[in-house]
Amino acid sequence: MANSKSAKKRALQSEKRRQHNASRRSMLRSYVKKVIAAIQAGDHAAATEAFNAAQPILDRMATKGLIHKNKAARHKARLNTRIKALAA
């Protein structure tokens, strides 16, 4: 347990940040899951709409440092490839 005043404050801030990041990460996963669900259902229009909603969220989370920018790019590329395969 933290003994000094500053260590206690850091522990509180760390926990607060952890909960905030967990919430953001959960939201991000929900957006990605919506796209995947639409792809698996075979609904190109819904998949495209969900992807367009998820794209800026992925970019924002990468900018904020929640996920790595390469991970965001990888998610977007793979989802987009699967959506394009639906149209073909």
Curated annotation (Swiss-Prot):
GO terms for biological process: translation. It comes from the Bacteria. InterPro entries: Ribosomal_bS20, Ribosomal_bS20_sf. Keywords: Ribonucleoprotein, Ribosomal protein, RNA-binding, rRNA-binding. Pfam families: Ribosomal_S20p (PF01649). The keyword rRNA-binding applies. The keyword Ribosomal protein applies. Residues 1-27 are annotated as: Disordered. One of its GO terms (cellular component) is cytosol. Signal peptide: none annotated. Gene3D superfamilies: Ribosomal protein S20 (1.20.58.110). One of its GO terms (molecular function) is small ribosomal subunit rRNA binding. Belongs to the bacterial ribosomal protein bS20 family. NCBIfam families: S20. Binds directly to 16S ribosomal RNA. This is Small ribosomal subunit protein bS20. It comes from Shewanella woodyi (strain ATCC 51908 / MS32). The gene is rpsT.
